[in-house]
């Protein structure tokens, strides 16, 4: 079966590999154009583009699926298209090209967390279980019927990055299985059922910790925002990045945002009990262990995160 693969970030690479390893004829790879990366803003291929080049696959570069991209997709003559985090909408004209349509691997248990940041929103919401589904892409936002589902437990210390890494590999297997079922005529899709929730892309502000919130909510927010956009706070008006924090229910006498040593640990007060800082990146400096940073300051008396 001739397959068009569409994807851009690193989480899509395991799916591309899985389809190639399963023996599908990947006739083309659709990905977003090279983007400037790092402080020097060097134009860099997407992880999917780089992997496609290693595999010797034809690549279609498109920031959006416009007329030019549609022409290239049509020329590739795919029987089906598999899409994993491509980063753009697929218009009806493109949806109609493959005879089996487009099959999307989405990292949530639809209809929960429809949108661009399902794993991050799931962690922030405190879900105990999430997962991934393969579904038929259609005009609506993640609304199509579901072919396959897998579940994944959300650990108490999981960041969105760690959870997404696991789902990217288990989801790749699910995607290959779904395409195999389609190829053999054994696939069946069922309409989505259940409560709908939305997962819009995270903004920088989504990582801004509010120390008046309960510690549990702050911990979830920090884990959900890691690695991107990153958890952060303000200190003397400057943005300070933070790694995920640890809950410290044994300490309840710190005011929200106030810092203090507790043995060798650095604690911050919240709206409930304290949390322990793990690593911190002050403005203009590298990430470092929180106790090392605090010892460099000297006294933490009067030091307050905003």
Curated annotation (Swiss-Prot):
Record's GO cellular component terms: cytosol
Binding site for (6S)-5,6,7,8-tetrahydrofolate: 108-111
GO molecular function, one term: methionyl-tRNA formyltransferase activity
Domain of life of the source: Bacteria
Keyword Phosphoprotein included in the entry's annotation: no
Gene3D superfamilies, sorted: 3.40.50.12230
Main enzyme class: transferase
Function: Attaches a formyl group to the free amino group of methionyl-tRNA(fMet). The formyl group appears to play a dual role in the initiator identity of N-formylmethionyl-tRNA by promoting its recognition by IF2 and preventing the misappropriation of this tRNA by the elongation apparatus.
Family (UniProt): Belongs to the Fmt family.
Stated name of the protein: Methionyl-tRNA formyltransferase
Taxonomic classification: Bacteria, Bacillati, Actinomycetota, Actinomycetes, Micrococcales
Recorded name of the encoding gene: fmt
């Amino acid at each position: 079966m001739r397959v068009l693969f569409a994807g851009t970030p690193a989480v899509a690479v395991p799916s591309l590999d899985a389809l190639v390893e399963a023996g599908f004829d990947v006739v083309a790879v659709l990905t977003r154009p090279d983007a400037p990366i790092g402080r020097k803003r060097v134009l860099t291929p997407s992880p999917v583009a780089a992997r496609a080049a290693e595999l010797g696959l034809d690549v279609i570069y498109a920031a959006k699926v416009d007329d030019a991209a549609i022409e290239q997709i049509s020329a590739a003559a795919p029987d089906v298209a598999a899409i994993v985090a491509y980063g753009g909408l697929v218009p009806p004209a493109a949806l109609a090209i493959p005879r089996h349509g487009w099959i999307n691997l989405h990292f949530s248990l639809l209809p929960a967390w429809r949108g661009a940041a399902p794993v991050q929103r799931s962690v922030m919401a405190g879900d105990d279980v999430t997962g991934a589904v393969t579904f038929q892409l259609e005009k609506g936002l993640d609304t199509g019927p579901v072919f396959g589902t897998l579940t994944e437990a959300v650990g108490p210390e999981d960041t969105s990055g760690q959870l997404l890494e696991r789902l990217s590999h288990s989801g790749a297997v699910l995607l290959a299985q779904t395409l195999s079922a389609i190829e053999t005529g054994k696939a069946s899709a069922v309409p989505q059922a259940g409560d709908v929730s939305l997962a819009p892309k995270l903004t920088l502000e989504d990582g801004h910790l509010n120390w008046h919130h309960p510690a549990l909510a702050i911990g979830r927010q920090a884990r959900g925002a890691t690695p991107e956009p990153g958890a952060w706070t303000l200190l003397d008006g400057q943005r300070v990045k933070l790694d995920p924090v640890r809950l410290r229910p044994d300490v309840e006498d710190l005011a929200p945002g106030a810092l203090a040593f507790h043995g060798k640990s650095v604690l911050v007060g919240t709206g409930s009990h304290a949390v322990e800082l793990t690593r911190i990146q002050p403005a203009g400096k590298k990430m470092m262990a929180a106790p090392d940073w605090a010892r460099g300051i000297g006294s933490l008396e009067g030091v307050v995160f905003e």
